[in-house]
Amino acid sequence: MDDAELARRSILGFGEMVATLGGDGAVRRPDAVGAVVGFAADNHWLDAAVVPADAPPPAADDAGLPHCLWTVADAVPGRREEPRIAMPCLGLALDRRAPVASVEVDQPSLSELGEINDRAYGQVEQLAPLVRALRDDRLVTHGLRADGAFACVALTLRIGDDISIQYVATEQRFRRQGLASRLLTAVMARALATGATSATLQASPDGLPVYERLGFRRVATLKAFLRAA
């Protein structure tokens, strides 16, 4: 599987995850996939949409679009780039992975997953309210426990034969113990066993080294363009 296809899948996964979170605010059109989320209008990853890999950006700003538009393009009419938050898109062909030993992975509730993410990223009721309301058969939660409680979590969205890995988070006191690597290795092994051929995600600065050690490679960079004030 080449980089262009992995990039297409990663970008689609990000947009479809945001649209799924957005509920009634979902935006799905040929040049933008995401959601308008009013209470998170200052969050560039929740009140957001992505331009599909094979589409040009919208020709002009549109009040029906969220405040942040992500794209691989170098410019978007009517918007200004925020270069500090450019986001690497990563992908991995699962058929290249060797068998791995299993670890015990449980399924946290959506509420638990959202709350752990908010704590991990220093937010209060940003992601959690949206995640609690999710109702989609393509979504699966995953988690590892430590001291009897969930310490590391992730959410996957199945799109065709790709799993889009989203909202990986580890509680502060359990970081730097390899939990995220162990969890994602198990998640990908399970996905491969159910017919998935790729895993894709978007990386934060903290997560990027973890994902690269797991074999993910950078296949694109999404740039953030904000509505001009």
Predicted features along the sequence, with ranges:
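Acyl-donor-binding surface of acyltransferase catalytic domains
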Residues: 40-104, 225-227
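A conserved beta-strand-loop-helix scaffold within acyl/acetyltransferase catalytic domains
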Residues: 125-171
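Conserved active-site alpha-helix within GNAT-family acetyltransferase domains
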Residues: 74-82, 181, 193, 205-222, ...
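Conserved acetyl-CoA-binding loop-helix of GNAT-fold acetyltransferases
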Residues: 55-60, 170, 176-193, 213
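Conserved GNAT acetyl-CoA-binding A-motif
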Residues: 63-71, 191-203
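Conserved acetyl-CoA binding element of GNAT-fold acetyltransferases
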Residues: 43-53, 161-172
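N-terminal charged segments
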Residues: 1-64, 75-76
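A short beta-loop-alpha structural element at the N-terminal edge
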Residues: 1-9, 101-113
